[in-house]
């Protein structure tokens, strides 16, 4: 029993280990593609964000360069186009011959970091009032013209292209038979026809007149002909008369033994036996199957 319990315990442990291994392998097979897809999605999103940041920085840097290139002296006054305009004058600078003149411009410095985007500007002023329309809003309908008289017909135009072919018309009624023509020339003789069927048997001929038969003279002896083919085998001959009996043959081998005969009648009953000895009861039984008796014997 203890050995069987150990086998069951080891079997349970082995099955559990195999089951956990299969579950772990399936989990890895399912998790790895999901992690790969997530990492690929994050990488693609980061690349899009970096490209967007680069484009924004490039746009900001372009606007900064445009602001630097604007001339500060040419400033347009505000409220231009209203009641009063303010003309901005350029700053007057006095000349000085004895002053030190600035040197040549140095090399361009490294571009600075892009600044933060500015705050949205204040809303603009209302626009100027629009001009009145040059044309009326409702279209003016001119009076209808009087109908002119019909002019003379023009010259005929060139013939048009030929139309498509029409469908087949209905079949006409059969015409009258023509007059028979003149007989034609004799044609060449045709090929020989197939042989005709055999004719009916003719009438039997008349019997020849009876005349005495006169034998003719014998002709010369001819050369001997070739040997003819062998003839058909002849009919088998009749059976002959039976012969005289032959001498006595040797003795044959002994035959197989015959089958057993029928069982005999039962014999008479024997004399009754004597009285048997007294039985001996076993004293105890051993574990290995032996039996011990009171007289010390073992069976």
UniProtKB/Swiss-Prot annotation:
Keywords: Collagen, Cuticle, Disulfide bond, Repeat, Signal. Residues 173-197, 250-268 have a biased composition (Low complexity). Residues 129-161, 215-233 have a biased composition (Pro residues). Disulfide bonds: none annotated. GO terms for molecular function: structural constituent of cuticle. Residues 103-132, 151-177, 181-202, 216-278 are annotated as: Triple-helical region. Residues 1-27 form the signal peptide. It comes from the Eukaryota. It holds the Pfam family Col_cuticle_N. The keyword Lyase does not apply. One of its GO terms (cellular component) is collagen trimer. Residues 163-172 have a biased composition (Gly residues). Residues 107-278 are annotated as: Disordered. Collagen polypeptide chains are complexed within the cuticle by disulfide bonds and other types of covalent cross-links. Nematode cuticles are composed largely of collagen-like proteins. The cuticle functions both as an exoskeleton and as a barrier to protect the worm from its environment. Belongs to the cuticular collagen family. This is Putative cuticle collagen 155. It comes from Caenorhabditis elegans. The lineage of its organism: Eukaryota, Metazoa, Ecdysozoa, Nematoda, Chromadorea. The gene is col-155.
């Amino acid at each position: 029993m203890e050995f069987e319990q150990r086998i069951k315990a080891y079997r349970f442990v082995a099955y559990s280990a195999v089951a956990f291994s299969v579950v772990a392998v399936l989990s890895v097979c399912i998790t790895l593609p999901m992690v790969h897809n997530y990492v690929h999605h994050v990488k693609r999103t980061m690349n899009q964000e970096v490209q967007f940041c680069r484009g924004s920085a490039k746009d900001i840097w372009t606007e900064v360069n445009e602001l630097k290139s604007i001339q500060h002296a040419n400033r347009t006054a505000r409220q231009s186009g209203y009641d009063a305009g303010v003309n901005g004058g350029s700053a007057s600078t006095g000349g000085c011959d004895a002053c030190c003149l600035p040197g040549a411009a140095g090399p361009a410095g490294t571009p600075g970091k892009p600044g933060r985007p500015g705050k949205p500007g204040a809303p603009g002023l209302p626009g100027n009032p629009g001009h009145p329309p040059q044309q009326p809003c409702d279209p003016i309908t001119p009076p209808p013209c009087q109908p002119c008289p019909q002019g003379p017909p023009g010259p005929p135009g060139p013939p048009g292209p030929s139309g498509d072919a029409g469908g087949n018309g209905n079949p006409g009624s059969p015409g009258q038979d023509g007059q028979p023509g003149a007989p034609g020339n004799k044609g060449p003789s045709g090929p020989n026809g197939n042989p005709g069927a055999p004719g009916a048997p003719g009438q039997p001929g008349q019997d020849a007149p009876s005349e005495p038969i006169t034998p003719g003279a014998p002709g010369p002896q001819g050369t001997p002909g070739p040997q003819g083919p062998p003839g058909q085998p002849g009919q088998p001959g009749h059976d002959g008369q039976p012969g005289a009996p032959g001498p006595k043959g040797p003795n044959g081998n002994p035959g197989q033994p015959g089958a057993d005969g029928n069982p005999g009648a039962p014999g008479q009953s024997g004399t009754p036996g004597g009285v048997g000895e007294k039985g001996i009861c076993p004293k105890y039984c051993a574990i290995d199957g032996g039996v011990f008796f009171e007289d010390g014997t073992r069976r």
